[in-house]
Amino acid sequence: MNIPRFLTRFTPNLLYKYTSKIFRKYLTRTNAPKRSKQIYKLSENMSEVKTQHYLSLLGTGPVDNESLSFFSSHPCGLPYLTDPSPYQPVPFTPLYEKNDTSDTFFNQTLNTAGTIPHALALIRRDILELNPRLQERESDSAPSLEPDFVLLVKIDTCLNGFQGTVHGGLLASLLDESLGCCVEALSSCLDLVHQRHPGERARLYTANLNISYRAPLTSPGAVTIKTWLKRREGRKWFLEGTLSGDDGRVRTEVKGLWISERSKTVL
């Protein structure tokens, strides 16, 4: 292979510095999307967040008013934001600042005008009122309820795989986060019902995600993600969800399993 003569004057370290400088200049000249809005905090005193139940944070944390306004006039938001509605808008916590490096994929990388300019979470009011009706889900034959947790997302064009098509990995991430928010809310609801201290809560971990891609999702556009807890068996939480496009057609389906950690026995 013929190496350009000017490159032979560089040592490996100098070559690395030279090429890195070129790439940095290139990246700063590209039209990288800027953040379209501020990054909210769940609380002015972030030290208090770790001492609160997740459901309490949803009930008291600030909702993104720009996203609320956007979806209040968008067809996908009308079923959930028009009175009487069984849903209440709540913070989509992955987009909120945590004063550490957690959730930076959502609250920094995806929190731009060209990626996800708007996102709004909604939860059933009966869950916030500590009446999650879990006894109705003890078997697969139980009647289906309205979604426990709904996420409305506006997706722009900087998250494409194929031209004009949203990357499937982004859809998987949105479904994973939505199911995670759903199970955290329901688990927190039970903790509050049984008057458990936040420090006593068992952590929940994703054990399995089975995603089926039914049809491509074009961009830009808005999506509706609906999630349900189907049943619970001991430490296992079985959830399902769907992701639909602007036209209401289901593009992606998911089934997930979350497992809570074993309780720690104090000796």
Where in this protein do the model-derived segments appear?
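Terminal targeting signals and extreme-terminal segments of soluble enzymes
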Residues: 2-219, 232-267
